[in-house]
Amino acid sequence: MSPPISPTPPPLQPPFPPTAIARGPDRPDPPPQHQQAAESLVNAAAQHVAPTCPPTSDELPQMEDQATNSSNDSLIPSRQAPDQEETENAITAGTPPDEMEPTKDAQTVRFSSSSPASYSTHEYPTEGINEPRTSSRAPNTASSQMAESSCDFRSSRDIGSIRMGASALVSALNALPWEEDDDSDDGEDDDEFIEPARGSSSTIYERKQRPQTPSTSHGFHPTHTLHFPFRQNAIARRACQPGTTELDYQYATPETSSRRTSAAGSESSSEGEVPLPKGFVSHPNLIVPSGEGEAAAHPDPKLISDRITKEQQIADVEEQAEILRSAEEQEMRLGKEFVPPKSRDSADLNVDAALREGGSEREDVIEEQMQTNEAEKRLTRNEKLAERLMEVFGLEEREEVLEEMKCWLLRSVMLKGYMYLTKRHICFFANMPNENNLLVKSGPLHKKASRSKLNTKFWVVLKNDVLSWYESTSDPYFPKGNISLQYCHSCDAVSGTRFKVRTSERNYTFTADTESSRDEWVKAIQKVMFKTQHEGETIKLIIPLEAIVDVEKSPTLEFTETIEVKCIDAEDQMSVDSYFFASFPDNDYAFSAIQKLVRERPSPPELPRISSVTTIHANQEPLDTSHATIKRHGTDSSAEKLGMASHRPFRKISSVLKPLILKSSDGEPLEEHSQGPHHNDEDASHLPHIEAISNRRRSEEESDNDYFDGYPPRQVGPPPPSMNDDARNWRPSWIRKPASKLFGSSPSGSFVSHPGRLPTDSSTTVTESGPSLRSRTGRTKQASVTEVMEPPIQYEEEVSEDEMSNKPSVVDSNSAETARKRAARLSWTSETSSGSQMVKSKSDFSMLGSESGHSESAETVRKFRTFFALSDKEELIDHFPGYLYRVLPVSGRFFISTNYFCFRSSQLLYKTKESFRLMIIPIRDLYGLKAQKAFRFGHSGLTVVIKGHEEIFIEFRSASRRKACIALLEERMEAVRLSGENTIVDSHKIEARIMEDLDESTPVEPKSPWPVSPSPLFGSTTSTSFLEFKPEPMKITCLTIGSRGDVQPYIALCKGLQAEGHITKIATHGEYKAWVEGHGIAFESVGGDPAELMQMCVDNGMFTVSFLKEGLQKFRGWLDDLLNSSWEACQGSDLLIESPSAMSGIHVAEALRIPYYRAFTMPWTRTRAYPHAFAVPEHGRGGPYNYMTYTMFDQVFWRAISGQVNRWRRNVLGLDATTFDKMEQHKVPFLYNFSPTVVPPPLDWTEWIHVTGYWFLDKADEKQGEKSWTPPQGLVDFIDKAHGEEKKVVYIGFGSIVVSDPEEMTRCVVEAVVNSGVCAILSKGWSDRGSKKGEPKGDSEGADGVKYPPEIFAIDSIDHGWLFPRIDAACHHGGAGTTGASLRAGIPTIIKPFFGDQAFWAERVESLNVGSSIRRLTSHQLASALIKATTDEKQISKARVVGEMIRKENGITRAIEAIYRDLEYAKSIIKSLPSTDDRTPERISSHLHPLTTADLSFNRVRSRSRSRSRSSQGRFSPRRHTVDDDGWSVVSGGSRSRSGSASAVTSPERRPLNIGSALGSHVFKTALLPNTFGKWRNLEEGDDR
């Protein structure tokens, strides 16, 4: 509410000159209140000070003289009194708002009308006039309070320090349309005068400086800067950009003014009239120009125009500067580079935050410190979003965006995009990903051979758009075969776990391990096919509200609720298309918003119809136009709206999996040639008729074509005449496509288009020429859903032959040839498939050393791309014959292209080299080239060094070929390094960002370089591998024992799981409690002393005979304590992750009936690729030995603990005794927390075994609430000093190892450091744990009686993550965590293994050539290893490459994804609890093969099992009668307990109450989970294995 208007304000004596207040017969007296208020403001402007109190009688003559002088020299701004200049400078400096408090004696002057009647007559809303809320610079003034109360120029509300020249304020007031203004908005309520922030719908213009010519008789008004806040303001709008009406008004003659005034007085209430501010009274002679003549009133128009243009340019510059300064503060994203300001629309412009300083050389912008107004921020964003929505979707007019929501569009693929709700449309926008070097999926699959029909297991990799298979995961450059998904027809699941990939030439059959794995592969391949065949395209879906039939919720997905929008098909009124949207931020809110929008949609006459080329005959039989691409020539208003997308052809894709192409009777695809603009109007006006005839002819000729799928029925007879009439006079507003499904077949369309990559994949091309197709007046078209798929723009330097054919001048034989080539691309026969790539290489590279001396032929390029499955963008530069050495030389030909170095063997029948007949190496992976002597006489050798791979040896018959090959490869290596990423601006990325740059949500999470599914587009729709899906928060327990290195990875994993919302707990040894809880993780203690365990392992070796004998004596009680404490620690868990070394997890999970995972730091699953980590030989012994080590270890390990474990199962867990085979440990999901770069996954591992990458824990020693870790004093100086002396710094430490002779080890280390000439950082760590009490311990000066030289800096412990990147090499014991840390830092690693898995990591480091292994620690061997690690450039470079690859991994993220993916599988293998009733039927074997035989009772099976067990024990265990149930033996393993009671059903009395007592027969039957992997093993097979 505005303040009350004082009816009788105190009289004021305004200091106006006599000329300004002279009255005559033609100048009636204005109302005194109005005059006094206005004159106070104008007087303040004349003196360039804030309004002050009225002048006294002594000051009045001086004021009159000044006013007279300035009136005479009104056109000369430089004539100002010196005191005025001083005042101006003082005011320009500014007065803080907090100093501008009015005193008590300040007088208040208010505007008021002369009478209530006149006030009501002229009570107009003043939109925008209340902004900006400027503060007066002079305190204690009546004028200041008058302005605050009347004009709402309040002093400091929502703004900071504001400088404002009063003259500019008056200029802004003069710019207001006091008379009729056609550009003004309609009046609104007076409430907006009080709250301008809510009424922010006024149009905003940028500033234009007004000409400095007098418009009133008040004399000269000096121009100065008016600093407004960065917000919408009507005053600034008129001052910045005066319209023609305003200029005519201000510079009009008295006669014109009188005429306008009288007209305004007679039509004061007319619609569209801009009212006066509240309190002002319209008067005919209020602002009549002075009588200085018409010359003064009419300045030179050219001068005015030039001044306005100049001020417009200055305002543009200042506005952009202010926008850039305040964009970050106000959180505005303007997208400047995407929407160039070609035309300045009033709705897109903001008021200048600062106006130009008139006559001043300084044109800086003063930043305004103010709080962000959220309402204005949303309004500004919505305005920009509406503009961009009109640009991107090509809407005919700007529509206000009511809602903006992220969601998914569900079809055969799931597209993530944005939904926009307007009053007339539902719009959806998605951008197809365009990423290179993207690993989509990899894993083992069986491939069926084409001739032998045998299945061979390969490691299959889906990368980019190529599906390749390899014999080994460690040989990524020699694929056995590949498939380019760009030319694939389909990928479908067949019977069992098989699926087929179909191409034009042959079919490929693959077999997965499980059906879920098969489905994931099919989904991944299908989505890559779609992405590849529509790379870089944008998907736009426009649903008019009048086409919507119903909106309802639909449980389409098993893990989320979808919203189904049903739309009527404009082509066929009997069919309804459904569009499914899911994964809204709030599904209920989105559903209610869409429903509300549909309910409140305007009536049909109010909605503009969305025209479509296929809806002109909506009531007739639908014609197939799915292959039609309609293009127009000339200009169009709609094309201007579309902007950069207006010249692109649109394609509507109906199906991805069924690329069927229509053919004519002669087998050639139909194509109508484009009509150029030289055709007459009669021909052009019948183009839609031509389209209809073409479609009808296709429909008739397809009677014998098997591509027809039977629905809808074929059209019979010619189209009705009404359709032709409609086609002649109708012109679409912009190019649209029919309403059929984008990715799935629609009931209204019987044919599907080929999902090719080219932008002109169409069998019918219709060109709209000029303005021949006119819009029909008075007739509306039925709205249809528009689906547009826009191909990427090809730049001028990459104009394709298809684009050339669409030019107007091409209507000759060349066009026919181009059409034939384009049709060949669409055909899927073997001949035309090959022809689809027959595009001449446009290589501009030099043909160095080329035998032919010219560029390669199109046929050679085609074969090259086809054989190596490369894209059409890959250009062949040259090729050479030569030999590739693996074991023996393999003859073939080497190919060099823009990005690849390839080899193809010519010895196709040479079976021993079959695996090496194909080589594809990316040039970016080449590290170097080196010429060398050949192995054979008369040849020239070449060594190719590859990053992260072994060297490759090549031979040529002549030195000239080798020289040419080296020159080309070096040229391409340099070009690839310099080019980096493509810098060409992708228009579709721009358009995608146009819709996404205004998104206010959180930033996108960084993608994992080794993702299970790199983006949601490639995620499976199943709930276990869909990345957007997260299970409900769970209580997850991690169970592990061992050293610090065994516990640390679980801390990292638990922190990642906590970030996902889960509750985590670690159960391990009690000495780690403070460390674990310091990271905010719950802790449970389990039994066992890790120091004693390590001492025994070091003394006896891992699982040797002496180790087992000592274990029989010492660790029987240790194992019982471990088992019981593990059971107690895991209570209340929803999911269990265990290290296999804990030995109890699988039994605890079975008793708790919870999903169970295993995780370990070394290989534990049987494979032929690597030996067991506890049985690594000094030299490799091959696959059979490796597999045998796992079998032997599993059997021995189980025999050693089975007696105690089975007794614990019966007495504590209430479970039956088990065997090694019954546990089925090979079916348990496994997470290996080491890098696939270091240990590539073997082919014989199943899909639920994941090599995730290292689980690094940065700053492991830090605790919550404590300050960050700092290095020991002097360590940084030691490292810097060594590097300054050009010495290498190495780390030597054996952290968690108990050394039997620490004195000898210390002396050996010191001698090796001195002899190698390096500086060392020595950490003994836990080496003192095994020492006896009372022995002296080491310090920084020495230890074990050995004095440290200056080259050694001794520490107790160190953060490896901090230290390793600062040094040159590391020597340690080879623990999994320490090895991962040194490899991650990219430094050579020396390992001295002591026990356990350390020998395995030493072997891997040596195999990768990133370090050395020392089997026996001597000073000589250690010194040699240190010298090699610090001087061998090959080893240093290889370690650097491996470090880069490891740093790109995200092991924790991949581990969590694997947990989600296999969660359902882990639940499916949970074993059922035993029955409490002998009459309970035997458990079913599988949900696929249930046992239905009624005569198989549990008693009969149990008796057979018991008899067989006893007979087995009679043969193999003669001591069965002398061994007690509680006895423990490695050989017998408690045989009597297993034979006597292992298979017997435990009575309810012997079970814990919380497990067995509540279980009845019915509960047991209903609680059974199906076993997906075949039948359960029959109990009669016996208990012992």
From Swiss-Prot:
Membrane-related topology note: Peripheral membrane protein
Residue ranges annotated for the PH domain, each copy included: 438-530
Stored Pfam families: EryCIII-like_C, Glyco_transf_28, GRAM, PH
Record's compositionally biased regions (Low complexity): 255-273, 1529-1545
InterPro entries from the UniProt entry: ATG26_PH_GRAM1, ATG26_PH_GRAM2, EryCIII-like_C, Glycosyltransferase_28, GlycoTrans_28_N, GRAM, PH-like_dom_sf, PH_domain
Residue numbers spanned by region Disordered: 1-154, 177-225, 249-279, 625-645, 666-852, 1499-1555
Function: Sterol glycosyltransferase responsible for the glycosylation of ergosterol to form ergosterol-glucoside.
Name under which the protein is recorded: Sterol 3-beta-glucosyltransferase
Organism in which the protein naturally occurs: Cryptococcus neoformans var. neoformans serotype D (strain JEC21 / ATCC MYA-565) (Filobasidiella neoformans)
Lineage of the organism: Eukaryota, Fungi, Dikarya, Basidiomycota, Agaricomycotina
